[in-house]
Curated annotation (Swiss-Prot):
It comes from the Bacteria. Disulfide bonds: none annotated. Signal peptide: none annotated. InterPro entries: ComplexI_51kDa_subunit, NADH-UbQ_OxRdtase_51kDa_CS, NADH-UbQ_OxRdtase_suF, Nuo51_FMN-bd, Nuo51_FMN-bd_sf, Nuop51_4Fe4S-bd, Nuop51_4Fe4S-bd_sf, SLBB_dom. This is NADH-quinone oxidoreductase subunit F 1. Its cofactor is FMN; [4Fe-4S] cluster. It comes from Rhizobium meliloti (strain 1021). The lineage of its organism: Bacteria, Pseudomonadati, Pseudomonadota, Alphaproteobacteria, Hyphomicrobiales. Keywords: 4Fe-4S, Flavoprotein, FMN, Iron, Iron-sulfur, Metal-binding, NAD, Quinone, Translocase, Ubiquinone. SUPFAM superfamilies: Nqo1 FMN-binding domain-like, Nqo1 middle domain-like, Nqo1C-terminal domain-like.
Length: 434
């Protein structure tokens, strides 16, 4: 379990002073100018050495991503864009950073912008986050007044930070759709290549990072890459914010070390499973877009990228959704299908048509008003959507259903049998989805 002195986010619950003075008293903005004086290469190499992987879901090495930016300017400005469009069902970590600990993010923006030669950073905040945006803007205004941001500031590097409010579309959490939205266009993902590091915002070199990825970098530089790599297993280093919701006794967002066993995370921070461990049905370990894992497999699972991949799932945003045996698992996954159908931007045919198909067949599965062969047909549809779209929304819509079929097929067949038995006893004629 992580000790309090090792926590990066010291005010994640908003119990302390979140102003600039309070943040400085807790050690933020300490030595920032010295980091900038050490140069861009030192910062990028230190972040690489720390093994920090993107905290937005994909887990791409952050230092490597920063190094893709052109070293020399070709006349075009460089931009840093922070993805604060936190819309993944179950995820609520970034909003706590912006609402209660915004100076970790602002200091991170300054350091990351300097490392990539950017003089402007844009923070794209989810449309529904009203209070979070107000808190973040107030913190930015404080930094301007104190002389930490703007032209000729105390840090010796000109940097402006702008907050942009989204309009409520989940698809704008995809980095290229976010850039389109930021430019004032319809939020639809772009084809890659060209990648944002080459042609991003307004056609200029851009790096898009998650809020948590940016917010942890100042502490990594202050305490050293060696300190950060002391947490977690190889290739899964550092600390992580876990958002635990669902059927636990105390749902919470908590910072702990990577590679913590699932049962330890739940027992130490959440007061255990509602009704005890025998009552655990399934867990979605990384936000709604990763497959669910049965409770029996999940108890001893290691909460990191590799540990959950071995179970056929993923860490994603570390939004842990716990379901006990009172849950209708088929209906829960249908609800996710309905979400993805609603949020598909409609640009790619497999996703536009496939999400609707998956939702409608899942609706039949919830009622049991289906044939057993439709389970295989549903799986085939998910395979035709997965990997055939510009962005990962198609995969995100397909994976929860694949996880359901893989682990809970007997439950689906049982429901079909029950419905068929009741229907045929009343002389009804069953139809297949085809």
């Amino acid at each position: 379990m992580l000790r309090d002195e090792d926590r990066i986010f010291t005010n994640i619950y908003g119990l302390k002073d979140k102003s600039l003075r309070g943040a400085m008293a807790r050690g933020h903005w300490d030595g920032t100018k010295q980091f900038l004086e050490k140069g861009r290469d030192w910062i990028i190499n230190e972040v690489k050495a720390s093994g920090l992987r993107g905290r937005g879901g994909a887990g791409f090495p952050t230092g490597l991503k920063w190094s893709f930016m052109p070293k020399e300017s070709d006349g075009r400005p460089h931009y840093l864009v922070v993805n604060a469009d936190e819309s993944e069902p179950g995820t609520c970590k970034d909003r706590d950073i912006m609402r209660h600990d915004p100076h970790t993010l602002i200091e991170g923006c300054v350091i990351a912008s300097f490392a990539m030669g950017a003089h402007a950073a844009y923070i794209y905040v989810r449309g529904e986050f009203i209070r979070e945006r107000e808190a973040l803007q107030a913190a930015i205004d404080e930094c301007y007044e104190y002389g930490l941001l703007g032209k000729n500031n105390k840090l010796g590097y000109d940097i402006d930070i702008y907050v942009h409010h989204g309009a409520g579309a989940y698809i704008c959490g995809e980095e290229t759709a976010l850039l389109e939205s930021l430019e004032g266009k319809k939020g639809q993902p772009r084809l890659k290549p060209p990648f944002p590091a080459n042609m991003g915002l307004y056609g200029c070199p851009t790096t898009v990072n998650n809020v948590e990825s940016i917010a942890v970098t100042p502490t990594i530089l202050r305490r050293g890459a060696g300190w950060y790599t002391s947490f977690g297993r190889p290739n899964n280093h550092g600390t992580k914010l876990y958002s635990v919701s669902g059927h636990v006794n105390r749902p919470c967002t908590v910072e702990d070390a990577m590679s913590i066993p699932f049962h330890e995370l739940i027992e130490k921070h959440c007061g255990g499973i509602r009704g005890g461990w025998d009552n655990l049905l399934a867990v979605i370990p990384g936000g709604s877009s990763v497959p669910c894992v049965p409770g029996a497999q999940m108890k001893d699972a290691i909460m990191d990228y590799d540990g959950l991949r071995e179970l056929g799932s993923g860490l994603g945003t570390a939004a842990v959704i716990v379901m006990d045996k009172s849950t209708d698992i088929i209906k829960a996954i249908w609800r996710l299908s309905a979400f993805y159908k609603h949020e598909s931007c409609g640009q790619c045919t497999p996703c536009r048509e496939g999400t609707g198909w998956m939702m409608r067949v899942m609706e039949r599965m919830v009622q049991g008003r289906a044939q057993k062969r439709e389970i295989d047909m549903l799986f085939d549809v998910t395979k035709q959507v997965e990997g055939h779209t510009i962005c990962a929304l198609g995969d995100a819509a397909a994976w929860p259903i694949q996880g359901l079929i893989k682990h809970f097929r007997p439950e689906m067949e049982k429901r079909i049998d029950e419905y068929t038995r009741n229907a045929t006893s009343h002389g009804a004629v069953l139809e297949a989805a085809e």
